[in-house]
Amino acid sequence: RASAAGEVGKIKMENGEDIFSPAREEEVLANVLEAHSKYPNALDVNTVRAVFREIMSGSRALQKLLKVTYLGPEYSYSHLAAIERFGQAVEFVPVGSITAVFEEVNRGHADFGVVPVENSTDGRIADTLDMFMRMPQMIICSEIRLQIHHNLMAKCEAKDIRRVYSKPQAISQCRNWLGKNTPHALLTEVSSTTTAAELAQREPGAAAVASRQAAVRYGLRILFEDIQDSADNETRFAVIGHQKTAKTGNDKTTLMFRIPHSPGSLADAIAVFKSNKVNLAWIESFPSRIAKNEYIFFADFEGHIDDPKISKMLKAFNDECTEVTVLGSYPIAQISG
């Protein structure tokens, strides 16, 4: 396989084709999982996915070592999402903000970036939507849906915890549990779950809410697992870059659009999806930076920009809007983690 991957890489380079092909990788994985389903006593599905993720990652690296930037530091949930999508055989570059992720990709310092878009508990990630407004040339070429598992970790015993560190979103997602189980601890917000784990490592009486991987990295003991208030806590991430993704037949498209500031304009725009029998999966409004009291809308719908049905729908949709930007079409991700 390694030899074949190297030859494929040469052909791709000669033809100017993309090394990272989400559509092709989804096709390979779907075939593997279909074959796997025929063996009832085989490995767990998540194990099979992880193994083939690394095989594809290693094969990609033989063609070109990709550079992927993410909202750090190491072992943040953005890092875990990046590993889930690209495997370990890439050069990961942590940066300090979502803005920096976009800038690194835009300047060509990284091939791809991984940014959070939406959490099932806390909703949209405003910084990410804001950067799409600032850099609409960025293309979403893949998505990752990561099940978020928050854990309470420390070097001390649970009864000795006086302070709990984590990022604001993690504290928010575990607030009820923390209130019941660590009522005397001071909840302290920091920049990331990894920073929280680092502080818990060196500060007596401190604990952190973070991932299992962060506990291993900083030598902390997990006192309680899965402490998030919602069992279905999930974050959706976007992979941004400069390349478009081919259709797979199981895709979604993300739009950014502006509508006239008049009664019924949003209803008229949304009606286009219904009349063309296109499933609208997500819509979010965001204050415009151009005009006061005007909003930019983001939307996900099922289908690919290259589908004739979608092309027809977008023509009608454009007629109802003052501006439409297609941020990308990409395979619909299955939840992992």
Predicted regions mapped to residue ranges:
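Domain-level signature for soluble enzymes in the chorismate/prephenate branch of the shikimate pathway
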Residues: 1-337
